[in-house]
From Swiss-Prot:
The keyword ATP-binding applies. Keywords: ATP-binding, Cytoplasm, Ligase, Nucleotide-binding. This is D-alanine--D-alanyl carrier protein ligase. The keyword Transmembrane helix does not apply. Disulfide bonds: none annotated. D-alanine binds at D203, V307, K503. Gene3D superfamilies: 3.30.300.30, N-terminal domain of ligase-like. Pathway: Cell wall biogenesis; lipoteichoic acid biosynthesis.
Amino acid sequence: MSNKPIADMIETIEHFAQTQPSYPVYNVLGQEHTYGDLKADSDSLAAVIDQLGLPEKSPVVVFGGQEYEMLATFVALTKSGHAYIPIDSHSALERVSAILEVAEPSLIIAISAFPLEQVSTPMINLAQVQEAFAQGNNYEITHPVKGDDNYYIIFTSGTTGKPKGVQISHDNLLSFTNWMITDKEFATPSRPQMLAQPPYSFDLSVMYWAPTLALGGTLFTLPSVITQDFKQLFAAIFSLPIAIWTSTPSFADMAMLSEYFNSEKMPGITHFYFDGEELTVKTAQKLRERFPNARIINAYGPTEATVALSAVAVTDEMLATLKRLPIGYTKADSPTFIIDEEGNKLPNGEQGEIIVSGPAVSKGYMNNPEKTAEAFFEFEDLPAYHTGDVGTMTDEGLLLYGGRMDFQIKFNGYRIELEDVSQNLNKSRFIESAVAVPRYNKDHKVQNLLAYVILKDGVREQFERDIDITKAIKEDLTDIMMSYMMPSKFLYRDSLPLTPNGKIDIKGLINEVNKR
C-alpha cells in the first residue's frame, strides 16, 4: 500500500495517538515512549506554555540533545502556536549567545543545563518540563502552528559573522514531508524504524523525524555522548533494530571503520538516506559491498529549501561508470533551474548556479532583511532561492553537482573547484580520505594548494618518510589529475575535523591554514 500525503503534522501525530497509543514513537537506548505518551506529555506542556502569556507566535529556544523531552517539547510548542529554535547542547557558547541575540526568543526551554548565566530571557528547565508532563493537563488545540506560520527556525553555522536563522513554515514542512513519504526514489516504508542520529539543530534531523511521525513509525536515538565514542557507538548501533539509516556520508564512513558494520550484523537495514554533504562514489561503493541489498539514496538541498529538493536511488551502473554521483530528480512541486551569472536560465547540459523555487522555499532569514534580500527572490512568480551551488541538469531530469561557488578558487589563471581536487585525491590507492585547502597571500590571492590526507591502513608502513608517500601519491594520480590542480604540500592526519553537523569542516581547515 502506498503512503498518502498528510494535511497537517500535529493532526497526524494526534491521529496515531488515537489509533496506536501504545506503539513506540521514541526509543532512547531501549527506553521507549509511545504515541500516547507523546500526546499526553505535549498536551500537558502546551497548557503550561499557554499559561505563560508569551507573545503570540513568538519563537522559543529549545536547548538539548537527543532526549525524548526534546521531541515532546517541539510538539507542545507547535500545538501552542510557537516556532521552536533547536540548539544542540554541544554548541559553542559564542554561537548560543549569537542565536539569542538574533532570534530574541520569548522563552528558553533547557532540556540540558543551559550554559550561559545572566540571560534575561525567561527559562524553563528539565525538572519543570517533567513536572508539566506529570500534571496531566488536557489541552484543546485551538491556535497551533499552521500555513505560513514558522514551524521551526534552524540557524546555519556560518563561520564568519552572525549565524542566520532559516525560517521554515508548516507549509514548507508539508511540501518536504509529503514528497519524502510518497516519492519512489526514497520508497519510504510505512511505520519506518528510523535511526535518529543527527542533532535537531541540523536540518538533516527533519529527514528522520518528519517522515517517521507522518507514517507512525519509531525513532531510535543515540545520545551524542555515545556517537562521539567509537567503542560505545559501535556497541550501541548494532543493538538498534533500525531499518532506515539517515546521516551524512561522513558519519557512515565513521561507522564503516568497524568491520561489523555490515548486513550480516545488521540485517534489518533496508535503506540509507544521505544528505548534508556530497556522497562520493567511493563511500557508496564501500556501503554497497557491506549492504548489497540496501537502497542507497543520495539527496540534495539547502536548509533554505527545507532539507532537500532532489533525491535518487544509487544504482550499480552509476557506481561502475560515474566519477561523481548525480544528486537526484527534483521534487515535482519545486521547479529547479540552472542560471548563468546574469540570471538567465540555461539549457540542459550547461553548468551554472542551481536555483530552487516553489512551496518549500523559506520566507527568509530571521530578523535579517539584508541577507534575505541577497539570497531570496522571485523567479517566474514563485519564491526562489540562490543555492550558491554549481550544477547541471541532464535531459533525463537528473541534477548533477559541480561544487560550491564559494569553494571555487582562481589559481595560476585556472578556475579550480576545491571539491574536484578532493574527489581526484580520493582516487589514489594510498588515500582513505582527503580534502584540498587553499593558502592565501596577503593580497588574498591563492598562493598554493594543500592537501589534508588520511592514509589507508598499512600505507604509512610501506614508506620511510612522508615525502616518499607524497611522491607515490602524485605518481599514482599523474593520469587522473591535471598538474595545476595537484596540491604542492600534503599533510597527513589520523582524522579530519568535523563540524557539529558531521560534515568535514573545510572552512575550519581553510582558517587553520591561513591562521584566521
